[in-house]
Amino acid sequence: MTAPLPQGELTVARMCALTALSRAGYYRHWQASAPREEAIGVRDAIQRIALENRHYGYRRIAKQLGREGFAVNHKRVLRLMRQDNLLCLRKRPFVPVTTASKHGWRIVPNLARGMQPSGVDQLWVADITYVRMREEFAYLAIVLDGFSRRVVGWALETHMQASLTIAALKMALNGRRPQPFGLVHHSDRGVQYACADYTRVLDEHRILASMSRPGNPYDNAKAESFMKTLKQEEVDGSDYRDSRQARNAIGKFLETIYNRQRLHSALDYRPPAEFEANLPALHPAPRQRAANGERTCP
């Protein structure tokens, strides 16, 4: 026996009788309209994600759709984005910038070359870039984990003194507390990284220093790639009134958008914070110090 319907609810047969439509015709219409409604939902989601992440390409948007429960491949996303004129503008090719390294401070060899970290806090990469404001420039120093790509330290000031890079390094140290002798810190040969004040902090925390070869920014490719992303997705096109506004806006991008929301292709399209949260342990096992590992400041 069929259970009684709630008062006011119509059966399919009753609706078909009232509209002079056969039941077969009703189901044909329903089956044809369902994919159209699903396509509208996918298109709406693509538009929302593209507007919220204006530098996402179709592959990242396809990955985000998958995280939201949509079963759609990147080719379909590309087609829909092309139809809706949502494709990003073609990015300019990456042009590396060589850092001047003519100074009298100690230069150390490149320990990071060929290194393949297997966990966090085994390799940190550091770099500096400029930030254009209305009337002057500011300078941003970052420390990036070479395994998870997470920004673990940063500082922004209107000068390029060693205190800028030291502030970024100390933020990373306070937040991560790496194991002694288990971490390589890689940078270019800039004076801010080679000077005694900076290397003293590395020595105090038993961190092994590493530097790029002269005139070869590709030795620090992970940091350079991050700076390119930062410029494209936050700095370029922004109108920072002063260093305070720049610090607030860039800090939000680093801590919230980049670390916690932006999908990273090297992490199987996961944000760095999520990638780290799924690792079995935060710190690697400490390594033994090499016999010739003693380093002193100049």
List each language-model region with its residue ranges.
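Charged DNA-binding/catalytic regions of mobile-element recombinases
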Residues: 1-298
